[in-house]
């Protein structure tokens, strides 16, 4: 990245860091190059740097069984900042990341940024991962429904639409009982959540 950055404009170097825990099988493997056994590990924290105004991305950090912390995040930013301009971070709203947001004094009502650890005059904005938010909204809709203008709408409305759609005029195209019956791992499927709210 350091070498590539020399040929980029300042605009191309505007960077967002996205990170997530990737869940792994808990098997062990042997690293031939390092001559050591790796695992078993439950997850890997992976950080990706990507251009905001240009089409590039690069994995820059990974560590097994490691939640993101303020210290790790600041260390990564300090290593990237001499060559690129970090303006935002993006992550899901899992419990460990909610703890990170709290340690950065991020809250929805008052503060959506923190000072850049390399330059306190610069701000780094914090965004929730949109696919994760979409799944959370869908799950909340299925579990509790929404209240809009003092009226409750819930999955029973969708159920009624599915039941009363006929073959000549299908109101909820591609919506089926499957979209309402998602359980466990199926609740992590972004495509199914997007389909439910797209009709």
Task: Give the role of each language-model region.
Residues 59-199:
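Non-catalytic regulatory appendages
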């Amino acid at each position: 990245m350091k070498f590539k950055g020399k040929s980029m404009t300042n605009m191309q170097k505007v960077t967002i860091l996205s990170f997530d825990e990737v869940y792994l099988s808990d098997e062990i493997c042997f690293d031939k190059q390092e001559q050591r056994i790796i695992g078993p590990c439950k997850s890997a924290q992976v950080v990706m740097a990507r251009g905001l105004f240009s089409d590039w991305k690069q994995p820059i950090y990974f560590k097994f069984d490691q939640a993101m912390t303020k210290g790790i995040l600041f260390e990564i930013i300090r290593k990237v900042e001499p060559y690129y301009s970090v303006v935002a971070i993006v992550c899901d709203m899992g419990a460990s990341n909610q703890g990170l947001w709290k340690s950065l004094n991020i809250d929805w009502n008052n503060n959506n940024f923190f000072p850049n650890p390399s330059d306190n005059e610069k701000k780094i904005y914090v965004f929730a991962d949109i696919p994760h938010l979409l799944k959370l909204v869908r799950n909340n809709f299925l579990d509790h429904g929404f209240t809009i203008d003092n009226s409750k709408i819930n999955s029973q409305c969708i159920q009624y639409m599915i039941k009363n759609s006929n073959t000549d005029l299908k109101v909820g195209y591609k919506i089926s009982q499957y979209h309402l019956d998602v359980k466990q791992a199926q609740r992590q499927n972004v495509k199914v959540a997007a389909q439910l709210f797209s009709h």
